[in-house]
A protein has these predicted regions:
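Generic structural signal for well-ordered alpha-helices
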Residues: 42, 65, 69, 109-113, ...
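Glycine/proline-rich, positively charged
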Residues: 29-30, 47, 92-196, 203-207
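Terminal-tail/helix-coil boundary detector
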Residues: 2-3, 203, 226-284, 299-304, ...
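Structural motif corresponding to the early beta-alpha repeats
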Residues: 75-100
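Short acidic capping loops at alpha-helix termini that bridge into adjacent secondary structure
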Residues: 17-18, 76-81, 85, 119-123, ...
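Conserved, mostly hydrophobic/aromatic
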Residues: 9, 21, 38, 53, ...
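Active-site beta-loop-alpha junctions enriched in small/polar residues
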Residues: 24, 56-58, 86-90, 126-129, ...
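N-terminal binding-site loop/beta-alpha segment at the start of enzyme catalytic domains
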Residues: 1-81, 147
Length: 370
């Protein structure tokens, strides 16, 4: 599968490549890259056939957008790429510094347009649910921005499934443009979205765009029980905080080393078992653990494009190579089994076997159309 195996994003005519370039690290110091490195990464992605670029207003305090605006303008690439940015997280102080209200979205979007040196955004993501803005207001705001030509499409991230379902239902009933894609944490280490978000996306014609498919580096093969348990704390502070302190990470300093907001949830017995299986599949196939983990994500139901965040050009090349991997049925089954999330009581009622016998009286019933 080459990078030029383009696909539509959701039920729309927006065409994207199978990997999306995430630029959260553009402009950061500790965990990312400065302008020359970011330019090289951007160029390598475009040369590989990629056309989908993702950023946000808060990434590197706006520096990520500024860099992208320059790269795109200098390369005369605006018409050939799909440019996505986000709003929702606070970019300052005060109640209107963030959120999903019309006031903040419009203000944030205008600032993003200036930094990106463009007059429209192809895909505007709602970055996070604010828990207070009515779905009706958010939908009307996004529809108005589409009508005004400020954005072409919109999607949503880090938001409860019930709220997204309400947005999508209102959009259909009112004849307004609804969200076409969902951006969520999805990897072998975390498959929580499979219970609600994946089937909801299929029902409403939305694509899944996974972020952190390597689980913040956990699935790259850099970590194991012994090294984590024996390691002395390093890189104190959250990655975002450390990145703003102007420090360049030391050689060998990894994303999950030392104090960080992810280790407690990722360094678990379940994930060590996933890594053991991933390592075994890697040894049997000759592919790196990272490539196998990426291949697994890209082949999951509903996934149209997968975000890759990189800090070196070589990582672009390695990630793209994962598109050519086709895992055997046995290897796929092994990874699926070891990474299967614990089934909640409610969802155990929806398993095919129970549905066949307890609901349809022993008959096999298939749904042919979404």
């Amino acid at each position: 599968m080459p990078m030029t195996d383009y696909r539509t994003l959701g039920r729309s005519g927006l065409v994207v490549s199978p990997f999306c370039l995430g630029t959260m690290t553009f402009g950061t110091t500790r965990w990312g890259s400065g302008e020359p490195e970011s330019q090289a990464i951007f160029n390598a992605y475009i040369e590989a056939g990629g056309n989908f670029i993702d950023t946000a207003d808060v990434y590197s305090s706006g520096r990520s957008e500024e860099m992208l605006g320059k790269f795109i303008e200098d390369g005369a690439l605006r018409d050939s790429i799909v440019l996505a940015t986000k709003s929702g997280f606070a970019d300052g102080h005060g109640p209107h510094a963030g959120g999903n209200g019309s006031k903040h979205i419009r203000t944030a979007l205008e600032a993003s347009l200036r930094r990106l040196r463009t007059d429209y955004i192809d895909l505007h993501w709602i970055h996070v649910w604010d828990s207070v803005t009515p779905a009706e207001e958010l939908l009307e705001t996004m529809a108005a921005l589409v009508r005004a030509g400020k954005i072409r499409y919109w999607g949503i991230s880090n938001t409860p499934a019930w709220y997204i379902s309400k947005l999508a239902t209102l959009a259909v009933s009112r004849g307004l443009p609804g969200p076409i894609a969902l951006q969520y944490f999805y990897s072998l280490a975390n498959r929580d979205i499979e219970d609600e978000f994946v089937p909801m996306a299929a029902e409403f014609g939305m694509s899944i765009v996974p972020w952190s498919p390597l689980a913040f580096g956990l699935l790259t093969g850099k970590y194991n029980r012994e090294s984590v348990e024996s390691a002395a704390p390093r890189a104190a502070g959250l990655p975002r905080e450390a990145a703003q302190q102007g420090e360049r990470r030391a050689d060998g300093d990894k994303r999950l080393d030392g104090a960080n907001p992810f280790g407690d949830s990722l360094f678990t017995e379940r994930n060590w078992k996933i890594l053991d299986t991933l390592k075994a599949v890697s040894e049997e196939t000759g592919y790196s653990q990272a490539k196998i983990a990426l291949s697994w994500v890209t082949h999951q139901t509903g996934v149209a494009s997968t975000l890759m965040g990189v800090s070196r050009v070589a990582q672009i090349i390695d990630n793209v190579a994962a598109l050519d991997i086709v895992l055997s049925a046995d290897h796929q089954a092994a990874l699926n089994a070891i990474s299967a999330p614990d089934q909640k009581m409610l969802y155990s009622l929806f398993t095919p076997v129970l549905r066949q016998h307890a609901v349809f009286g022993g008959s096999t019933v298939r749904r042919l159309h979404p």
